[in-house]
Curated annotation (Swiss-Prot):
Its cofactor is dipyrromethane. InterPro entries: HemC, Porphobilin_deaminase_cofac_BS, Porphobilin_deaminase_N, Porphobilinogen_deaminase_C, Porphobilinogen_deaminase_C_sf. Tetrapolymerization of the monopyrrole PBG into the hydroxymethylbilane pre-uroporphyrinogen in several discrete steps. It comes from Histophilus somni (strain 2336) (Haemophilus somnus). The gene is hemC. One of its GO terms (biological process) is protoporphyrinogen IX biosynthetic process. The modification S-(dipyrrolylmethanemethyl)cysteine is found at C243. Monomer. This is Porphobilinogen deaminase. PANTHER family: PORPHOBILINOGEN DEAMINASE. It catalyses: 4 porphobilinogen + H2O = hydroxymethylbilane + 4 NH4(+).
Amino acid sequence: MSINKTLKIATRQSPLALWQANYVKNRLQQRYSHLSVELVPIITKGDVILDTPLAKIGGKGLFVKELENALLNGEADIAVHSMKDVPMQFPKGLELSVICPREDPRDAFVSNKYRTLDELPQGAIVGTSSLRRQCQLKNWRADLDIRSLRGNVGTRLNKLDQGDYDAIILASAGLIRLGLTERIRSFIEIDTILPACGQGAVGIECRVDDRDVQSLLMPLADQTTTYCVLAERAMNFHLQGGCQVPIGAYAILENNQLYLRGLVGDVHGSQILSAEGQFELSLDFESSQSAVQKAEELGVSIAEQLLQQGADKILQAVYQS
């Protein structure tokens, strides 16, 4: 792109979304000192409708549609998203260009009364609107009273502080990025609650034909995070899942081995299906395209294991409810 042109970043207006957009802006300007970068804050449907669970109004895709429209009509050059909010498919003409380094992928236990999930008394009120968290919490502790909790991070913390809940569950990455680490009473380990696909990662979407912008973005990509998140998303896509379904996935890349664990649960926690596997990624010898293909094949493989266990029946029941 022309050095005189301003790069415009579409972003939601929540504090966390603005942090992510500014993170991308700062990284770009550190690398390209003469590049002018401007934020284009946009209110999305998901930010406006706060009194209804996301699963009832179309899932987390509601947080990205208006940003994608800004890309398509030329109001913005790129859009910055939390990867766990990004739908599996993109509108024609748009693509996921870059996935940035991942923050802590775990969920966080936040409470003014208790230090851990284990300390919660019988019948404790726990706030979350995530079906993924709900099914795993109910499977672990059927006695817990899980209640809906919508809004940005500050809104959710305020509801906790007002006494509406004994505890709430939030993504630790958001709290860390907003400088609210002190609100985390404990991190919930992966074995207790498996994260959402892409949780903790920031993605950048742009137009397919905008090669100049894509070349600017490439230095921001994190190879390890990319392979892990693409494996998680491939699993989700093969399950025909979305962002607001009781599906969890988490991949790690260590010593050229890509490990992926996946989970599907019924919303009441009465049935949890899980599967895991690994593929070798010889990063020193394989092209990035070949590694991406292998990562996605691993995701499909884990999805197939879950489908063989009956995941499709569980998800069908969720969609019909």
